[in-house]
Amino acid sequence: MKKWLAVALAAVLLLTGCAPKFEKNKEVVQKTDDKTEKAFIPNYQISNKYYRTILPFKPSKTRGMVVANLNSRYDIKEFETGLMRIAKSEYSPEKYLFQEGQILDKKTVSLWLNRKYTAKQLKDEGLEASDNIGLNPLDDEKGSIDDRNKKNPIYLAHVLEQDYLVKTDKDTVKLGGVMIGLALNSVHYYQKEKYGATYERKIPHKELKAEGEKIAAEVARRLRGMSELKGIPVTIALFEQESKSSVVPGNFFEYATVDANSSSLNAWEPVKEKYYLFPDTTSEKDHRDDWTFFMNFKQDVEKYFSSNGVIGRGFYKDDQLTDLRIEIPIQFYGEAEAIGFTQYVAGLIMDNFPDYISIEVNITSVNGPEALIEKKPKEKEPYVHIYK
């Protein structure tokens, strides 16, 4: 399906005069501190909005850790793609190539995610003194388990590295910049006994921000001490992940850069991005007009089929709704019914929402995906695909 959509997208771009750049594969040499490797730059670039990756693809040295450390699939996806969005402000896709992190390995990140330890705790954990590099606060083991977790929650959930390569001459690329994402917990989960009930300690944003900035400063210091990053600019971004029960992802809220010849962070820059669930009391309170658009759409859908499962996830940038993804679970009893309903929904999209919003509607049944509807900003007609 992804391959089919890619072909369809290419066709649309060609028809609208915005064709992707189709160039020959470019063989280059990738230089690191201790070796050189041959690599290829892909010949297709769909848009200047996306980074090219060099081939063969190198998976991150911390591959798989993000799945275990973040609360939901929504957070996992947004943590990676959101960091790439921020990267564009520092490393242009027209100049830089993307590569998954090759400097921080699993052992390093695992140790960073630990708490600080006392000498006794180190011994109990079977760790050496050199391993006592955790970025989360010490548990002094004073007071009840509740008191200890409320006093010193786990703030840092994960560290994500993204590398951005730049051409140094016609046939050579090297590391040009690094993005580091720090995933921070908005809720700290703990247990009073093994396999016991799970308890929560909510972490206010102000507290999260302050602790995140302290952690970022220490991460910047450590990164600058690595030989691989000598003279390389590093940007660190703070991500507030949502609770385990949330059906929308968290968001990055600020970032700062360590210049190539510096070991300290520049001033923090705000990131004005946020996801909202529709319908929901928070979206109703913060974005009443958009909430009304969605509710009118939902009510019109339910005139055709009674469904309480119509939900939307809206992405806001600078307090403006830019993307809305809608899920409609429906039980169909025939293909004609599915086609008719899809056409009806496509019309509702055009009637109910402003034309500056990018909209994606996924219609599903117990059998899986039934139809996809996409409407890009300013387009006169939506793209519709009915799965066979």
PLM-predicted stretches and their roles:
Residues L13-G17:
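C-terminal motif of bacterial Sec signal peptides marking the signal peptidase cleavage site
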Residues P153-H188, F305-I330:
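Short edge beta-strands and adjacent turn/loop segments
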Residues A19-F22:
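Bacterial signal peptide processing site
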Residues R201-E228, A336-S358:
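Short, non-transmembrane amphipathic alpha-helical segments
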Residues K2-A8:
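Sec-dependent signal peptide recognition
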Residues E240-H287, S306-S307, F315-Q320, N362-K388:
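Polar/charged, Gly/Pro-rich intrinsically disordered segments
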Residues E27-K174:
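N-terminal Sec/ER secretory leader and immediately downstream segment
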Residues L277-D355:
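Intrinsically disordered, low-complexity segments enriched in Gly and acidic/Ser/Thr residues
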